[in-house]
Structures are given as structure tokens and as C-alpha cells.
């Protein structure tokens, strides 16, 4: 059975394909913050969906805080509408194009872990409890980083697609606790039992045929 997970943060990039006047946007839209002496981009905070967006002068946008790709699309569409009201050269995006750059999720192995033993067993695990209470597992394929905790909880980062997240969690689970053996069903057990009971009967029949 696949490991259950919860997406807690999805980061994506997009482009509004227009030059933005960040000063003008910050003055006109209440939920935009712009402090160029501290950071070159403006910050747009949406309440629904609850997503934060970095806006840059060249029209590039970085979204974070979403829990699904649907929320990313909704946020970019909503942002383009807000900005279009102030700067008409920015088109309202009906079809939203974006690239997922990072996907962060939590999962649970539902068993306690011996992190010292895990670090000894696996070369790609780092564990320095005096610096951080969790162990760091790095997977090459797919390229993901996981934080492992003693209570079996994990935080996974680095996936760019949900399919890669699922694959990475499966790989991590098999590395840490091993592959689970397939359970034998009641029907299979009955077949095995029937097969073993038939063999002696056939042997008796052959013996009976040979005897005078």
C-alpha cells in the first residue's frame, strides 16, 4: 500500500509577460508590500487561496504556500486580475502556465526509527544529533532530500512533480524499513492446502494399480 503524504508547500514560477511598475502596484493594491532597499521584488499576499507571491519588474512571479497545483493556478489568475486593474498591459491569464520548482510534503512510516542504526546502514544518511534532532536522507533517483525523525515522521523536499514525490517516498520507505512481503490471501492458502493434499492421493492410486 502506497505511503500516505500531505503536501504542505508547493513552490512554482510563472511569467506575466509584461514589465511591472512595482511602486505603482504597492501604492494601488493594499496587500502588496514593496521595500526595494531590502529586496528587489514586491510581495503579494492572497487570502484565498492562502498563497504568497514574489513579483519582479520583468514580470516573473514566484508562488509559495500552496497545497496543490490547483491553488497555484488560482493564485496566478487572481494576481493577474488584480494587477490588470492597475496596469492594463498585464493580461488576465485565463490559461495559466507555470513550472513547479519544489514540492514539500510530510509523511509517516508509522513506526519508531533508530536513527543511529539507519545512518550506519545507509551511506546516503547523515545524522548529527548534537546539531539537529533528525537524520538527512538524500536520494539520487528521484533527486529528493528527506528529514527523518525518531517517531517515524518524515519531511520530503525537492520533488517537481507529485509522481516523483510518490516514487521518492516509496524508495525511502524500502531503504529504511525494507520491502514488505506480499500477504498470502485466504484463497491462496486454500489452494496450497488443496494441492498438498492431492499429491498423496495420486501416489496411493498409482500404488494400487501396480499391486496384483
Which residues make up each language-model segment?
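Intrinsically disordered, low-complexity polar/charged tails and linkers
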Residues: 1-145, 151-153, 159-212
